Amino acid sequence: MDFFLFAYMYGGGSYMKCPRCLNTDPSWFYKGSRGWYCRRCISFQRVMIEETMEPVSLQDVKMEAGEYSMQYPLTKQQKQLSDQLIEKIETGDILCHCVCGAGKTELVVGVISHYLRHGKKVCFAIARRQVVLEVAQRLQKYFTYAKVIAVCGGRTQVIDGDLIVCTTHQLYRYYQAFDLLILDEPDAFPFHGDPVLHGLAQTACIGRTVYLTATPDDTLRKRVEEGTLLSLQLHVRPHGKPIPVPVIHTGPLWLLLVHLFVWLRSHRNHPRIVFVPSRSMCHRLSALISLTQKCFHVTSQDENRDEIIDMYRKSKNGVIVATTVLERGVTIPDVDVCVFGADSPSFNEAALIQMAGRAGRSFSNPYGDVLFLCMERSDLCHRCRKQIIEDNSYLMQEGRSL
């Protein structure tokens, strides 16, 4: 055994650490002809352990890049959290724990502007590719004088701008590049539970990190409890109406199909999303629905999913059957939601909350409708329902009209 690795494994683990993904597990290190390298993050290009990584060189931020304007002003609650974020960000990392549909992107516009005005580099990192393009377009509308770029699979020709929006996978390009890193939905697949992506996020940021999510995982909650992460919370959507509480129906498959088709018909004046737990069910159920009406379907395996989602958006009051690929980030105005097979072990509480949170976001249909269809009684579904009711209770505490 090489002395370097032997000393690491039996000498307290203080001799080898990947400078990019921060791995210290000796089983991932390998010695090639050029020396030691980490195999855990080798898919992002080989990094030699003995070499010193240099911070990536990016262009300076334009002086006017921080100027912004939004079509609609922030609500009182949004403005309060936005101001707190700007005030507290200098003291440490922050978790913005906001309900689905609270306007998380708009909440961080102020702190993004604050950093850009001081010539600081900012990155908005997102777990899923299809959300990157939408968020980049939205931020470009707000920051009209800034060069906002989207970096994701198929869009890597330009990787530098005043404001960078990218997938978490693309953070490997930005070693020690950002003064502010905004991690959107860090509890979402594929970022959640991936130590390589977590390491890339840590090494890309030399300043502060803001975590945006409605469903913080145990790691973030523990940091809040330990006092290493400040939590700012927002339980109110901009329109001030409650989050739709799921109606739960349990029964055999044939009865669930009856409930589904009755629901599809009764909500035909709105766009509808039917979430399912697997790709195979997605294809089978969409084929069945297509016998009575036009129906789209999309999964993570569809290479043209952006085009499918765009066609669905343009269809009038259409139906789309989807896996969890649409559970986050994608907003469909006036949409109603059904989760078929909500009791499936493929779903966790966070996924159910996120799927239910697609409904009731728009001012034109602030109440929305959410239906959970289960083969068996599900404690998970009832916990999700209880959490949404608890979030809605904050409206009552503020004396807001429900």
Indicate where each model-derived feature is located.
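N-terminal pre-P-loop "Q-motif" helix
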Residues: 70-92
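Conserved strand-helix element at the start of the C-terminal RecA-like helicase core
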Residues: 97-105, 115, 120-132, 263-289
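Inter-Walker segment of RecA-like/P-loop motor cores
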Residues: 140-173
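Conserved helicase ATPase core of P-loop NTP-dependent helicases/translocases
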Residues: 148-158, 299-323
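Post-DEXD/H (motif II) to motif III coupling segment of the RecA-like Helicase ATP-binding lobe
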Residues: 180, 185-249, 259
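Conserved RecA-like helicase motor core of SF1/SF2 enzymes
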Residues: 185-188, 313-318, 324-366, 374-379
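Conserved segment of the helicase C-terminal RecA-like domain
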Residues: 206-210, 215-219, 358-384
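Conserved interdomain linker/interface between the two RecA-like ATPase lobes of SF2 helicase motors
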Residues: 228-286, 294-295
